[in-house]
Swiss-Prot record:
Alphabetized Pfam families for the sequence: C2-set_2, Ig_3, V-set
Cytoplasmic side: 346-388
One BP term from GO: regulation of protein phosphorylation
Principal subcellular localization: membrane
Disulfide-bonded cysteines: C44-C104, C145-C199, C245-C291
Post-translational modifications: N-glycosylated.
Ranges for domain Ig-like V-type: 21-119
Biological classification of the source: Eukaryota, Metazoa, Chordata, Craniata, Vertebrata
Protein name: Cell adhesion molecule 4
Domain Ig-like C2-type: 124-219, 224-307
């Protein structure tokens, strides 16, 4: 077992006073807590010691030291100090079976003793993380984390991208130690493949701020994807073109198939795995080339349209943006501009027509008034004749 640190908490002081002859002598002990494999010091403090016999015994009441002399052949126990003020022994490589009460006995006419209680804690080892079944994109994955031995029972936590995941924990006592397990379940996608999940274990046997961690790398299986990359954008007769089929997938497709539409590949073509080499291009090599890949989760296919130009032809390199998309965007912009222009013309015509109508109406009224003014007398006569 690896080397562990020694831990001591605020200790309960136990006092005993000898009565009768030899009164005034006192023995004081301190409780000790240590991590398994660590070093513990058990101390008996003496007050007004007069040289009486001092005996140190283990929890089984076996004498370890008698007045400073070794009585039990266990080299893990060493006498560090024997003085009128203090008796101190050192225990290395502490074990669970060492736990219990250690007796400091002072023999005068009456026997007096105090007990120093040794508590042994067990730090958790690195957790064991396992997956219940293979993770597939769109499904759920269930992970389990196990710490088979700790004391007190370890606390388990899950982390993903520095965020804590909620797990379900259970514990079982096995003698003096505890076995603790935790499970976590969550949905995964292809982007989660290779992600890190951490299971962390902590208890009081570890130094403050320390923990034991195990990282689990997610293995998420998903259907393949394929894309063809050309060694050059513009090819002319006599050039050599290399097409590369970039494939992803888990499990990775182990076979890639090259085709040219409904025709066979040119005799000069050399297909090796992900690459297709077309040397000495001629116009007869024109066509749609495809690469195909598959795994148990699906199938992928990529297309490349080969156009071989004359050596002296002036052409522009193909862009990565499909012409159909660019054409669609331009058509939409033209349509919007036409709609705006039509709306502006319609509003202008309507406003102008309304203005002309009002203007003509105003002229008619003014003309009638002027005519009435000029022919006022005749009109009056006509009105008189009408009424007569």
């Amino acid at each position: 077992m690896g080397r562990a640190r020694r831990f001591q908490w605020p200790l309960l002081l136990l006092w005993a006073a000898a009565a009768g002859p030899g009164a005034g002598q006192e023995v004081q002990t301190e409780n000790v807590t240590v991590a398994e494999g660590g070093v513990a010091e058990i101390t008996c403090r003496l007050h007004q010691y007069d040289g009486s016999i001092v005996v140190i015994q283990n929890p089984a009441r076996q004498t370890l030291f008698f007045n400073g002399t070794r009585a039990l052949k266990d080299e893990r126990f060493q006498l560090e100090e024997f003085s009128p003020r203090r008796v101190r022994i050192r225990l290395s490589d502490a074990r669970l079976e060492d736990e219990g009460g250690y007796f400091c006995q002072l023999y005068t006419e009456d026997t007096h003793h105090q007990i120093a209680t040794l508590t042994v804690l067990v730090a958790p080892e690195n957790p064991v993380v396992e997956v219940r079944e293979q993770a597939v994109e769109g499904g759920e994955v269930e992970l389990s984390c196990l710490v088979p031995r700790s004391r007190p029972a370890a606390t388990l936590r899950w982390y993903r991208d520095r965020k804590e995941l909620k797990g379900v924990s259970s514990s079982q006592e096995n003698g003096k130690v505890w076995s603790v397990a935790s499970t976590v379940r969550f949905r995964v996608d292809r982007k989660d493949d290779g992600g890190i999940i951490i299971c962390e274990a902590q208890n009081q046997a570890l130094p403050s701020g320390h923990s034991k961690q195990t990282q689990y790398v997610l293995d998420v299986q998903y259907s393949p994807t394929a894309r063809i990359h050309a060694s050059q954008a513009v090819v002319r007769e006599g050039d050599t073109l290399v097409l590369t089929c970039a494939v992803t997938g888990n499990p990775r497709p182990n076979q890639i198939r090259w085709n040219r539409g409904n025709e066979s590949l040119p005799e000069r073509a050399e297909a090796v795995g992900e690459t297709l080499t077309l040397p000495g291009l001629v116009s007869a090599d024109n066509g749609t080339y495809t690469c195909e890949a598959s795994n148990k989760h699906g199938h992928a296919r990529a297309l490349y349209v080969l156009v071989v130009y004359d050596p002296g032809a002036v052409v522009e390199a193909q862009t990565s943006v499909p012409y159909a998309i660019v054409g669609g965007i331009l058509a939409l912009l033209v349509f919007l501009i036409i709609c705006v222009l039509v709306g502006m013309v319609w509003c202008s015509v309507r406003q102008k027509g309304s203005y002309l109508t009002h203007e003509a109406s105003g002229l008619d009224e003014q003309g009638e008034a002027r005519e009435a003014f000029l022919n006022g007398s005749d009109g009056h006569k006509r009105k008189e004749e009408f009424f007569i």
